[in-house]
Amino acid sequence: SVEELYGHGIYDDGSVVREFLGKRKRLYADLLANDYEPPEELQYKTEYVQQIDDYLYKDVTYDAMWHFVGGLFPSPYAATSVREYFARGFEEYTMNNKKELKQSCPVLFNKIEALHALEE
């Protein structure tokens, strides 16, 4: 996978993680404002956590998540971990949804652009 090839280049400077956590904190606040009770870890965990995935999938539901992630994450599942955030962003990039990705996830978009340039 691209992440295995360039993992150090993706996460080392912390920019993708900072962007992801900023989005997770906003998601947390949006969920609270809409009478959900998200786990505290949603604000600061970057790795995959089963409790967070279960909460988003079972309690909020991925259908409802589309309402919260528009303009924030590439998809509901991209909110589950920073690795999934990168993977879904990369998928959007390769599926030619670059404009939307650049608008909603500029740091992630620029990181993928830089990795793409390395391959050429």
Residues covered by each model-derived region:
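Active-site-flanking segments in enzyme catalytic domains
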Residues: 1-120
